[in-house]
A protein has these predicted regions:
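A cross-family phosphate/adenosyl-ligand binding-site feature
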Residues: 1-84, 91-178
Length: 178
């Protein structure tokens, strides 16, 4: 797994945490002088078997719909020749907003794949559709995806994950965050 940490994602998790969990460098900047010759947004987009944006915010969906290429995550996605899986997570009102639903339609027409969102209690305390799908649901989607694509079991699958902010509350005090 290679991970791109967005500016918003940095508000919730550090690149050190992600690097420690994945065992690989976390990419953050479009122009990284250290990696200029080693890898770029084109290289990252070609490396992966699938690109996963998790969680996908309403803002990020809007950027993809309009074709913005303003950071590493959006340039990798625009340069990609692979399937892109979006895992939406946002407040129920944001998810139901006409602009978000229009962006959903457009992105589906572009060929983006979606898992979720699910109905449930949000971090803000409201209930409804907009909660990020569980890791288990995402895993089963990916398992089916790779099976349908006929990718062999022993192949070292490559996933590029872009991260942004989300919190899944276990109770009023404790939460899991990416």
């Amino acid at each position: 797994i290679k991970t791109i940490l967005t500016k918003s994602g940095k508000e919730f998790v550090t690149s050190l945490s992600i690097t420690t969990l994945t065992g690989t460098k976390t990419f953050e900047n479009l122009f990284d002088k250290e990696l200029e010759e080693e890898i770029d947004h084109i290289g990252l987009s070609r490396w992966a078997d699938i690109i996963i944006v998790m969680p996908t915010t309403a803002n990020f969906m809007s950027k993809l719909t309009s074709g913005k290429a303003e950071d590493l995550a959006t340039t990798v996605i625009l340069a990609a020749d692979k399937d892109i899986l979006l895992v939406p997570a946002m407040n129920v009102r944001m998810w139901l907003h006409k602009a978000t639903q229009k962006n959903l339609e457009v992105l589906q027409d572009y060929g983006y794949l979606f898992v979720g969102p699910e109905k449930g209690e949000m971090a803000c305390g409201e209930f409804g559709e907009g909660k990020m799908s569980s890791p288990r649901q995402i895993f089963f989607f990916l398992k089916n995806y790779f099976h349908k694509k006929n990718i062999v079991k022993d192949k070292n699958l490559k996933a590029l994950v872009t991260t942004g902010p989300t919190r899944e509350y276990l109770d009023p005090i404790r939460y899991i965050s990416n």
